[in-house]
Curated annotation (Swiss-Prot), chain A:
It is an enzyme of class 3 (hydrolase). It is a lipid-anchor. It holds the Pfam family Ras. Its EC number is 3.6.5.2. Transmembrane segments: none annotated. Regulated by guanine nucleotide exchange factors (GEFs) which promote the exchange of bound GDP for free GTP. Regulated by GTPase activating proteins (GAPs) which increase the GTP hydrolysis activity. Inhibited by GDP dissociation inhibitors (GDIs). This is Ras-related protein Rab-30. Its cofactor is Mg(2+). Gene3D superfamilies: P-loop containing nucleotide triphosphate hydrolases.
Amino acid sequence: MSMEDYDFLFKIVLIGNAGVGKTCLVRRFTQGLFPPGQGATIGVDFMIKTVEINGEKVKLQIWDTAGQERFRSITQSYYRSANALILTYDITCEESFRCLPEWLREIEQYASNKVITVLVGNKIDLAERREVSQQRAEEFSEAQDMYYLETSAKESDNVEKLFLDLACRLISEARQNTLVNNVSSPLPGEGKSISYLTCCNFN
Amino acid sequence: MADSLPTEFDVVIVGTGLPESILAAACSRSGQRVLHVDSKSYYGGNWASFSFSGLLSWLKDYQQICIDGEESTVKWPDLIHETEEAITLRKKDETIQHMEIFCYVSQDLDDNVEEIGALQKNLSTVASSTLTEPLDSACLVKDKRSVYVTKYKMPAKDTLKSDRETSLEVNDIEETLEKENDCGDKTRVHTDGDKDEKPVEDNMDQPKRNRITYSQILKEGRRFNIDLVSKLLYSQGLLIDLLIKSNVSRYAEFKNVTRILTFWEGKVEQVPCSRADVFNSKELTMVEKRMLMKFFTFCTDFEQHPDEYEAFKQRPFSDYLKTKKLTPSLQHFVLHSIAMTSESSCTTIDGLKATKNFLQCLGWFGNTPFLFPLYGQGEISQCFCRMCAVFGGIYCLRRKVQCLVVDKESGRCNAVIDHLGQRIHAKNFIVEDSYLSEETCSSVQYKQISRAVLITDQSILKTDSDQQISVLIVPPVEPGTFAVRVTELCSSTMTCMKDTYLVHLTCSSSKTAREDLESVVKKLFTPYAEIEINKEEHSKPRLLWALYFNMRDSSGISRSSYNGLPSNVYVCSGPDCGVGNEHAVKQAETLFREIFPSEEFCPSPPNPEDIILDGNDKQPEVPGTKNVLMAEVEP
Ligand SMILES: Cc1cc2nc3c(=O)[nH]c(=O)nc-3n(C[C@H](O)[C@H](O)[C@H](O)COP(=O)(O)OP(=O)(O)OC[C@H]3O[C@@H](n4cnc5c(N)ncnc54)[C@H](O)[C@@H]3O)c2cc1C
Ligand SMILES: Nc1nc2c(ncn2[C@@H]2O[C@H](COP(=O)(O)OP(=O)(O)O)[C@@H](O)[C@H]2O)c(=O)[nH]1
Ligand SMILES: [Mg+2]
């Protein structure tokens, strides 16, 4: 690992109802584009973007649902070693907001309890069709102790801010962790990943 | 969420167990349009893992009487054309039997338990004494299921407080830090100054026994990931190969099994299985050490010395071992814990092969030939499902299939009808055994697996470290019964709460699970009691909670035993009884090659890091960044 050219690596996972713009947010941030039409990018497990924060290279590994949210069938393993969760709803879709408690239940069940959760209301470019007021969302996120932000993947509003703020927060959490533990604590991958690399290291 | 399913696919797969999930990944990976459904609300079928409350709900579901197609809005007969006929599928899974639950810990009511999604306390009303009667299975059904707690807590680090002292973690394996556990490293520091924090126990010879109650188990219920089927991964086995080759390994994390144990003369002992182990063993005499080393050395290239075993080749391995100047306890080690064979059945040549295999599997990831997936076996099938979804496969749990629709003329299946009456077309269909109707399976002879799941308070073999993962084979006592495999998991495997162990017992059934396994449970454990009565029993770990059940073993059933299945309907079996997952992998690969003879089976997907992103602000990825350890922070 010492050859890696980054100081931190974090796994960020997106969840929320289908159609709220998760894939668009990821692609806006990592590729700088708003994909025309729908459809998942076949074969892409996660996207990577390395950002620099105060002179430190932070590699963000951003995981999308692979469409499994469509019929409420996300695998638990998807949540397992996430450092941060972006819980997304669509401000023009009341239903996507009303489903948030269900998503929180999944988080509670399967994610690490050290995970940082951000609530994102997407599609603010469609303000005229807004169904969920900012105030309601703020109250909800406060009650749940989550950070809250409104974005537009289409207009690129707040998308950078979302990921960069998250990265900052993750760094400070990780710092705190290592200070407190006085050991280089891998977070949260407590097990071994298996790969050919590991195999060759033995015997 | 009123999203309806697409209706055209290449492959429809019913059941999300391991073989079906591997197949789903393989099909999707090779460009097939896959629909993967399960009638349950969870992944994995009989390969699933559950939180404690999840397990209780699962048990409850099995005890309910079949509610006949309640949800079906449209019955299939109305949807079948004249040129077609239907093969109905089973409405209710019947692969689990003889469930018996025992709760040994007190179910005190002072704790205000509040676990989200959990069945609340006083679920079962078992006496907390040592005299435990099997819980009448009907008991559970009568229980009131309290309302789900609908308050959501922020998953913040301090929501739950460590309410016990932290035991010393003297550990010789690298990564036993429980980062995710509430009582883990971080919180530990937080609570250091707490008044209720008791002093750290530093006398390892007399480990402190915690008082654990049923409500604590319920409260910490989500810490549990209880496997229905208990398996391990051979470090050189087919599943590891497949995980690595297909890159599915990136979705999971593993720990090494740290010890192989043996039950010898009424005592649990560690089997020295590496050279270092043999040297360091305190149980072995110098002479024994030398004998064992010599034997191991011989086994690693036994083929080169045919003269040494030729005469015994087809005779029992146990007889052969008697000639090798090994003491009886060493013979026992080699036979049961290393070759993992049962006395009667194993020939010398197979025993030597197994021993050699064992020795070769050592040292790849650690000191034993086995790996265990964090969060339980149930993760593995889900990982393959994720891979399938990444390549466009569509997932739908809670979707029941009423019937397969067969075209009379061609004799081929061309669609399924789901419980909403929706007709879904495909070219090939893969169905897990438990979904097939009694009629289809009327001439099938099933075996059974006997299972026990125990929650205990201490390890069956205490050492400095309380974070051991151990495997113990208890040989059969009576003829006609089978060896029992015991797997003991510590909390850092993310399968049980802190200060407990999750113990799985597995054997081929000769009777009900309890009849098959209770004697082994009694040998190794003592029921939990508030006051220690019997001093002698003191050293045994205590049983807090136990579950017995039988699971159908549908492995090794030939396809021709099923009645009247069209040629494009393929059957996957449920879990087999073996330690490893080889059966599932072989089955998936065999079926895949049958359906798509010219396609490659689960090739490596492109590395996401190699997908160069367009756009002006991209950061070029440095080559050679493959095999990144997931989410590892390098400060
Ligand atoms: C270090 C070590 C590595 C092993 N690796 C494997 C392995 O990768 N896969 C595995 O299945 N077993 C492996 N075995 C053998 C395995 O531990 C036991 O033979 C098997 O679990 C016996 O279980 P049983 O008596 O319940 O099943 P059985 O009824 O004896 O066999 C169950 C099924 O497992 C298959 N099987 C048995 N032994 C092997 C083997 N050596 N290799 C491949 N298939 C086998 C058989 O075809 C059969 O279908 C290994 C043993 C050791 C000691
Ligand atoms: N107007 C607008 N449309 C958006 C925005 N983000 C996504 N969409 C559209 O919403 C639809 C669903 O987006 P997608 O990213 O696939 O959602 P996902 O299912 O959550 O991944 C697509 O048609 C997008 O074009 C946004 O910020 N503004
Ligand atoms: Mg999407």
